[in-house]
Amino acid sequence: MDTFLFTSESVNEGHPDKLCDQISDAVLDACLAQDAESKVACETCTKTNLVMVFGEITTKANVDYEKIARDTCRNIGFVSDDVGLDADNCKVLVYIEQQSPDIAQGVHGHLTKRPEEIGAGDQGHMFGYATDETPELMPLSHVLATKLGARLTEVRKNGTCPWLRPDGKTQVTVEYYNENGAMVPVRVHTVLISTQHDETVTNDEIAADLKEHVIKPVIPEKYLDEKTIFHLNPSGRFVIGGPHGDAGLTGRKIIIDTYGGWGAHGGGAFSGKDPTKVDRSGAYIARQAAKSIVAAGLARRCIVQISYAIGVAEPLSVFVDTYGTGKISDKDILKIVKETFDFRPGMIANNLDLLRGGNRYLKTAAYGHFGRDDADFTWEVVKPLKWEKPQE
């Protein structure tokens, strides 16, 4: 059997870039909760003892940006300089302006356009991907790396591993077999975890706890064997972390947010952007389309691309590739996709209920936007596709 290795990584919620994603999306949630028509393009950056929230926001909502930034940092666990940031005493700078009137006129006619008329907030191309290798219809390498990161946070917050600090990274290498275009996982080749920790714990204790409380509950036993390689805090020491260790910026973890290097990416980040920004809403509907194709049995693996022009409602192009796994031709699948999904930005927002705030976007900002079992992730709902199996 001819196999190959493929690797995906993840970072958990205390990573500086992910901290910024979460602050940006918490701001978006707060704006949408009070004003569903909010236009939000919110960026965040952070370094030692500093968080800056900046961008373009037009909203009727009364939002305390500084409070949102501090609350988000605190909820992650940044409660002292020792762990990388002190939420209550760090400096928070806010530089927010309104959306350009030129963009507002071209995209939503200063809120006068009907949903079906609303244009894309910018040009760009977005991808959706799905594969039958996991129940989530997501790549196994990405699913495992992401779940390891989430588990690190869980055992930190519930006290199972009290020596853990908020920052951490994971990486999983999976050995795969290509079965006529479909990806079949054979085994886990390598597991890498680098996690921030306090001064008191030894490397041996770290390795033992990570194996017992993080790896064991996450990675199914069938994928682990005596040859699986474990790199657990391979640099030896990771006490200084969070924004004290590295600067952070919104939108720098776009592969972690999506498919772990599988499929493709148009380059546009998600966090801090309202649904008129097709970087986000376009990628969400493309995932729903790809997932629905695989769930319907039309293909074992699929990628969908859509593209837009600023101010134009209809997509410029829609593309489907099933990597040779389709039960019918890609051309016929594309026809079904176009008949089933409305790719106009205003209609995506309506059909996926994307104008609702709360904490639904904050939830997306750590541990991936796709493959999540959560009612707020409306783009994960499979749409039934009508097709007839060809005669054998």
Curated annotation (Swiss-Prot):
Residues holding K(+): E43
The entry marks the following residues as binding L-methionine, namely E56, Q99, D246, K277
Question: What are its cofactors?
Answer: Mn(2+); Mg(2+); Co(2+); K(+)
GO MF annotation list: ATP binding; metal ion binding; methionine adenosyltransferase activity
Pathway in which this enzyme or protein is active? Amino-acid biosynthesis; S-adenosyl-L-methionine biosynthesis; S-adenosyl-L-methionine from L-methionine: step 1/1
| Chief subcellular location | cytoplasm
Q: Which reaction does it catalyse?
A: L-methionine + ATP + H2O = S-adenosyl-L-methionine + phosphate + diphosphate
Tell me which domain of life the UniProt entry assigns to the organism this sequence originates from.
Eukaryota
Residues holding Mg(2+): E9
| Annotated Pfam families | S-AdoMet_synt_C, S-AdoMet_synt_M, S-AdoMet_synt_N
Q: Which UniProt keywords apply?
A: ATP-binding, Cobalt, Cytoplasm, Magnesium, Metal-binding, Nucleotide-binding, One-carbon metabolism, Potassium, Transferase
Question: Could you tell me what the cofactor note in this record states?
Answer: Binds 2 divalent ions per subunit. The metal ions interact primarily with the substrate. Can utilize magnesium, manganese or cobalt (in vitro).
InterPro entries in the cross-refs: ADOMET_SYNTHASE_CS (IPR022631), S-AdoMet_synt_C (IPR022630), S-AdoMet_synt_central (IPR022629), S-AdoMet_synt_N (IPR022628), S-AdoMet_synthetase (IPR002133), S-AdoMet_synthetase_sfam (IPR022636)
Where found?
Answer: Cytoplasm
Positions binding ATP in this chain are H15, D167, G168, K169, S235, G236, R237, F238, D246, R252, K253, A269, K273, K277
- Provide one Gene Ontology cellular component: cytoplasm
Catalytic EC class: transferase
- Similarity annotation: Belongs to the AdoMet synthase family.
Q: What is annotated about its quaternary structure and interactions?
A: Homotetramer.
Q: What does this protein do?
A: Catalyzes the formation of S-adenosylmethionine from methionine and ATP. The reaction comprises two steps that are both catalyzed by the same enzyme: formation of S-adenosylmethionine (AdoMet) and triphosphate, and subsequent hydrolysis of the triphosphate.
Alphabetical list of NCBIfam families matching this protein: metK (TIGR01034)
Name of the molecule in the record: S-adenosylmethionine synthase
Organism the protein comes from: Mesembryanthemum crystallinum
The gene for this chain is METK
